[in-house]
């Protein structure tokens, strides 16, 4: 479950007294998400989401995340907008946790995205990058390339335990990533979402209606954000009983890239780097999943995601030599 910190009625009432939102009419925990405690809140003024940031979140990063969403909202980009308290501050404290109230975003997250939704998502991602072009905040990518080798050291046996031969496959991927790092460092950079999976995007029908969960946002290559989306939107299960059997849906990937380029055309260097960026983003999620898979105790409330899903992506990307391989 996603609610790690329980909020009493008395604590909620005292917290809301610091806002001009009226009294609570409805308040319930939200099951989605694994990083923070999230609640649906309805007051006489409207619908909101209340988030309590758990200890795994670096409190020093919270002003950056809040400022980012305020910036996007000021540009008219659809995302949850932080609500200011009577003291003019968005970040407050509830149940000994940093907490923030944001506006409610209409829409649903797609379970099986369509090609039209992928195109609309690509457009939305590019519009986000343009809207953030003049955002002054800066945050290093804590899960970027400089962290991957450290995350991998000592994990070879864990990889072999879930799939024989996987250690050698990962090492081969590292060789290719390392060869491309110097080139990738010169790509256009800016503020990226870095985690725009289907459960972090909302749609009204086939149309993208907004993005949520910016708590991995950072400063990095813009095309890396596109690579994250290709990994999370354009692969489908080839075998429902075998997580290692995934297939790249060329139509969805092509639609996503086309949607992005209709708003922000990729530079030649970004197109050339796309295979390496896709491989790198797959490595990032493989390593975090492998770590969770190996360290989460049996019977834990939060079930870790299978790293083999991203091992399959690594194997796919190693075979791709150009952006055309993704439908660009």
UniProtKB/Swiss-Prot annotation:
EC numbers: 2.7.1.39
One Gene Ontology term of the molecular function aspect: ATP binding
Keyword field contains Transmembrane: no
Domain of life: Bacteria
UniProt keyword list: Amino-acid biosynthesis, ATP-binding, Kinase, Nucleotide-binding, Threonine biosynthesis, Transferase
Nucleotide-binding among keywords: yes
A GO BP entry: threonine biosynthetic process
Pathway: Amino-acid biosynthesis; L-threonine biosynthesis; L-threonine from L-aspartate: step 4/5
InterPro entries, per the entry: Aminoglycoside_PTrfase, Homoserine_kinase_II, Kinase-like_dom_sf, Pseudomonas-type_ThrB
Family: Belongs to the pseudomonas-type ThrB family.
Protein name: Homoserine kinase
């Amino acid at each position: 479950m996603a609610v790690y910190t329980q909020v009493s009625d008395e604590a909620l009432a005292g917290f809301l007294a610091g806002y001009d939102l009226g009294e609570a009419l409805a308040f319930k925990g939200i099951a989605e998400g694994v990083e923070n405690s999230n609640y649906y809140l309805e007051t006489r003024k409207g619908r909101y989401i209340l988030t309590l940031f758990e200890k795994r979140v670096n409190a020093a990063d919270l002003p950056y995340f809040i400022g980012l969403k305020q910036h996007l909202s000021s540009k008219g980009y659809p995302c949850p907008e932080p609500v200011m308290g009577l003291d003019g501050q968005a970040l407050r404290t509830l149940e000994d946790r940093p907490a923030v109230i944001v506006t409610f975003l209409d829409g649903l997250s797609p379970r099986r995205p369509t090609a039209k939704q992928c195109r609309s998502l690509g457009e939305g991602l590019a519009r986000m990058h343009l809207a953030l072009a003049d955002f002054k905040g800066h945050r290093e990518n804590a899960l970027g390339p400089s962290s991957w080798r450290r995350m991998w050291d000592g994990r070879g046996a864990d990889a072999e335990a879930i799939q024989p031969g996987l250690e050698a496959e990962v090492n081969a991927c590292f060789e290719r990533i390392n060869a491309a790092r110097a080139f990738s460092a010169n790509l256009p950079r800016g503020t990226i979402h870095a985690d725009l999976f289907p459960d972090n995007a909302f749609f009204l029908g086939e149309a993208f209606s907004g993005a949520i969960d910016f708590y991995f946002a950072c400063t990095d290559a813009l095309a890396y954000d596109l690579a994250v989306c290709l990994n999370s939107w354009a692969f489908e299960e080839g075998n429902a009983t075998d997580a290692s059997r995934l297939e790249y849906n060329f139509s969805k990937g092509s639609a996503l890239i086309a949607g992005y380029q209709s708003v922000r055309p990729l530079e030649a260097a970004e197109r050339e780097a796309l295979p390496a960026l896709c491989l790198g983003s797959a490595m990032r999620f493989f390593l975090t999943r492998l770590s969770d898979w190996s360290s989460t105790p049996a019977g834990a409330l939060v079930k870790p995601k299978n790293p083999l899903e991203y091992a399959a992506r690594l194997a796919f990307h190693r075979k791709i030599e150009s952006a055309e391989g993704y439908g660009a």
